Amino acid sequence: LLTIFCLLTCCFSQAQKQDAAFETGEWFKFRIHYGFINASYATLEVKDDYLNGKSVYHVVGKGKTTGFASIFFKVDDNYESYFDKDTGKPYKFIRKIDEGGHTKDIEIDFNYEKEKALVNNKKHKTKTEYDIEKNVQDMVSAFYYLRNNYDVTDIKEGEEIMLNMFFDKENFRFKLKFLGRETMRTKFGKVPCLKFRPYVQAGRVFKESESLTLWVSDDENKIPIRIKAKLLVGSLKADLDAFKGLKHPFKIIVD
């Protein structure tokens, strides 16, 4: 579930660097529904940290099934990214998950001088180097990089966005299409949003390549407001449930 969430938050149109969209202390909580069942919660938090003597942002993402859903399919996911405060480049990515008994425990260290990623698979006790593309991002750092470096002021309906990403042991190009602007009803009030269609590989999880829709707040924060996904079995919806530490005012329309 957190895998889907992190992947979908990468969706802004390129422009010159703008005022920072986030700061240390930002925290999001998302309520995730599978059909009519309140299946899980996911959180994202921005912290200050040090890595190899350098001051970095450390983002921690967690996802866990709750209540009735955990009886049938237990999920306990942890994602972490350490990335540069100025450039947004990721230095280390951690993915430790347990999804219904399917487990992974992976750490990735990025070396930009060698243009390599060292993948430490702790579960299988292997270390392997892979070539990486320029301006590569991991699943978590991409969200924060795009929020700080991309602008959506003049984005046009139908415009497509591409991003270089590295995941587990693979480089891939992530594509999204802008579908337009829409005002969403939320627990906080009406929120003006940007609507996107991320393209994903159909198969084990998703029904088809256009199975996902994402709404992001149309303000300086660029907060993920809602995600909808058509799965091979059923459907999934994630809504922003709580937040704190926003750098900018949250644009809400009050009736």
Features from the language model and the residues they span:
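Bacterial Sec-dependent N-terminal signal peptides
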Residues: 1-18
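Acidic, serine/threonine-rich low-complexity disordered tracts
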Residues: 16-112, 152-255
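Hydrophobic, well-structured mid-protein blocks that either form specific transmembrane helices
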Residues: 104-150
